[in-house]
């Protein structure tokens, strides 16, 4: 499985209409791109732990999309609904990180820590 992880902070002064357009573009991607197996989008939660203070950037939101394989991720990235989402997204964020990860369930995933490349 591949996770497409996006951490982002909207730019200051983002208008309500722009937020709504971004949410609609996310919804359209989720509804129209069958390669997305699961989508989770939410706001950062803090609860007073020391590690929260160590973060250099406060990313307010996360979007985590799951794909069965690389072909699914590529289908998502090349889909017109993603193109529209990207246009809205890049117009709205102040800072963002985007990563793709191969992930495995349970102990199988731990084996990746044993690989040479850390």
Q: Where do the model's predicted regions map?
A:
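C-terminal structural segments of small proteins and small subunits
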Residues: 70-103
């Amino acid at each position: 499985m591949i996770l497409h992880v996006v951490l982002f902070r909207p730019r200051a002064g983002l208008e309500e209409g722009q937020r709504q357009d971004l949410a609609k573009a996310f919804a359209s991607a989720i509804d129209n791109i069958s390669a997305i197996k699961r989508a989770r989008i939410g706001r950062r939660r803090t609860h007073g732990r020391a590690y929260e203070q160590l973060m250099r950037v406060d990313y307010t939101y996360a979007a985590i999309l799951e794909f069965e394989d690389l072909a699914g991720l590529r289908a998502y990235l090349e889909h017109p609904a993603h193109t529209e989402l990207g246009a809205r997204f890049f117009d709205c964020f102040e800072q963002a990180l985007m990563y793709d990860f191969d992930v495995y369930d349970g102990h199988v995933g731990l084996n990746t820590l044993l690989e040479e490349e850390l």
